[in-house]
């Protein structure tokens, strides 16, 4: 029997799923962070209100930022899976580098290349390409 390892999920489902998870992670983490920060920066009698207001104003924005990152990363990852016809850690490493470069291209070529190297390195640490199987 010839069984090839196929992609776990269809491309669009995979990308939309990553966007949703990234938005949720950013919104929850942003809510906690901005609540604590807002409560700390509020006067003594209004700490709860200040924290709630800061979280409700800033958490969706951070969730959206995470969603863009997750969507680009997943899109590049799926594109590499389709081009290379295999799933391995190199896809996520290159996708992370491409995502880092695209997200910081507005700051110039030097910043984009630095960001690409850093994101690629970060994903190489998370998904080591060489190791035990």
Swiss-Prot record:
Keywords of the record: Membrane, Mitochondrion, Mitochondrion inner membrane, Transmembrane, Transmembrane helix
Compartments where found: Mitochondrion inner membrane
Topology within the bilayer: Multi-pass membrane protein
Inducers of expression: Down-regulated after antimycin A or rotenone treatments.
Keyword Cytoplasm attached: no
One GO term describing the cellular component: TIM23 mitochondrial import inner membrane translocase complex
Tissues where this protein is expressed: Expressed in cotyledons, roots, flowers and leaves.
Transmembrane segments: 15-35, 63-83, 90-105, 115-128
Subunit and partners: Component of the TIM17:23 complex at least composed of TIM23, TIM17 and TIM50. The complex interacts with the TIM44 component of the PAM complex.
UniProt record similarity statement: Belongs to the Tim17/Tim22/Tim23 family.
Role according to the record: Essential component of the TIM17:23 complex, a complex that mediates the translocation of transit peptide-containing proteins across the mitochondrial inner membrane. Links the inner and outer membranes.
PANTHER family hit by this protein: MITOCHONDRIAL IMPORT INNER MEMBRANE TRANSLOCASE SUBUNIT TIM-17, MITOCHONDRIAL IMPORT INNER MEMBRANE TRANSLOCASE SUBUNIT TIM17-3
Protein name as annotated: Mitochondrial import inner membrane translocase subunit TIM17-3
Native source organism of the sequence: Arabidopsis thaliana
UniProt gene name: TIM17-3
């Amino acid at each position: 029997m010839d069984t090839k390892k196929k992609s776990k999920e269809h491309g669009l489902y995979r990308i939309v799923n990553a966007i949703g998870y990234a938005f949720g992670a950013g919104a929850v983490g942003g809510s906690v962070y901005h609540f604590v920060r807002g409560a700390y920066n509020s006067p003594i009698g209004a700490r709860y209100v200040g924290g709630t207001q800061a979280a409700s104003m800033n958490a969706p924005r951070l969730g959206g930022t995470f969603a863009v990152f997750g969507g680009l990363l997943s899109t590049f990852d799926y594109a590499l899976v389709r081009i290379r016809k295999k799933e391995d850690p190199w896809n996520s490493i290159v996708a992370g580098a491409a995502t880092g470069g695209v997200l910081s291209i507005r700051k110039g070529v030097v910043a984009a290349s630095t960001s690409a190297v850093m994101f690629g390195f970060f994903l190489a640490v998370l998904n080591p390409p060489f190791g035990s199987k």
